[in-house]
Amino acid sequence: MSSGIHVALVTGGNKGIGLAIVRDLCRLFSGDVVLTARDVTRGQAAVQQLQAEGLSPRFHQLDIDDLQSIRALRDFLRKEYGGLDVLVNNAGIAFKVADPTPFHIQAEVTMKTNFFGTRDVCTELLPLIKPQGRVVNVSSIMSVRALKSCSPELQQKFRSETITEEELVGLMNKFVEDTKKGVHQKEGWPSSAYGVTKIGVTVLSRIHARKLSEQRKGDKILLNACCPGWVRTDMAGPKATKSPEEGAETPVYLALLPPDAEGPHGQFVSEKRVEQW
């Protein structure tokens, strides 16, 4: 076990913003960088691409929808490094605007990965985070827009400083159920499934940061959600304003906050600035 070596890990690291984050961490992080991807072939191809640039990330398979896959990664990190220093939860999906898939199916599929998959990764890997560790959950400005489109009752719940993880899970499940019944708008939900899943990611980040402050107060772990901006990726398309490299800036900034930093913690960060939630 090479537990003296620091290690950073990025989910969904084989393309787009994830790949740009891995590239930056390989250059700036003093330790090993693990690129994870659902598809082994694509993940290893991304590693080879970075190796051709003179960088040396490691690869490990990870499908955030598969608990066994998450646990295999957890065991690898524990055995190889005795824990984890930096976790960047970047993996996520979105349907294209013109996608003909029925809305309730889009809601269920997007929620499964973006919220529940990310939550499962946190459940398994947060206990491994070492003192002065950094956790970055890549959310979206769409979460802020979706929040503003929620009913006042839902907004109040999502902004609550005391909402529990169980309550948040209940709300995320309710959204999916409401879409199946065709009553989501009547129930105060916005019509962006992606936006609601990212509300989930942002609020989950606030909850986990609060728990870390309560349960591991002296460990100086900082956990935040962030928006990378509108980035030219397979997800956002070619018209977006930022390159993947520019999209990686805020996540990497949060991943590399100096050891003595007091914050940000439990915040939603965009363009390296704390945004009001």
Curated annotation (Swiss-Prot):
It catalyses: a secondary alcohol + NADP(+) = a ketone + NADPH + H(+); a primary alcohol + NADP(+) = an aldehyde + NADPH + H(+); prostaglandin F2alpha + NADP(+) = prostaglandin E2 + NADPH + H(+); prostaglandin E1 + NADP(+) = 15-oxoprostaglandin E1 + NADPH + H(+). One of its GO terms (molecular function) is carbonyl reductase (NADPH) activity. Inhibited by quercetin, rutenin and its derivatives. The active site is at Y194. GO terms for biological process: epithelial cell differentiation; glucocorticoid metabolic process; positive regulation of reactive oxygen species metabolic process; prostanoid biosynthetic process; vitamin K metabolic process; xenobiotic metabolic process. Disulfide bonds: none annotated. It is found in: Cytoplasm. Expressed in kidney (at protein level). Keywords: Acetylation, Cytoplasm, Lipid metabolism, NADP, Oxidoreductase, Phosphoprotein. SUPFAM superfamilies: NAD(P)-binding Rossmann-fold domains. Its EC number is 1.1.1.184, 1.1.1.196, 1.1.1.197, 1.1.1.71. NADPH-dependent reductase with broad substrate specificity. Catalyzes the reduction of a wide variety of carbonyl compounds including quinones, prostaglandins, menadione, plus various xenobiotics. Catalyzes the reduction of the antitumor anthracyclines doxorubicin and daunorubicin to the cardiotoxic compounds doxorubicinol and daunorubicinol. Can convert prostaglandin E to prostaglandin F2-alpha. Can bind glutathione, which explains its higher affinity for glutathione-conjugated substrates. Catalyzes the reduction of S-nitrosoglutathione. Belongs to the short-chain dehydrogenases/reductases (SDR) family. This is Carbonyl reductase [NADPH] 1. It comes from Homo sapiens. The gene is CBR1.
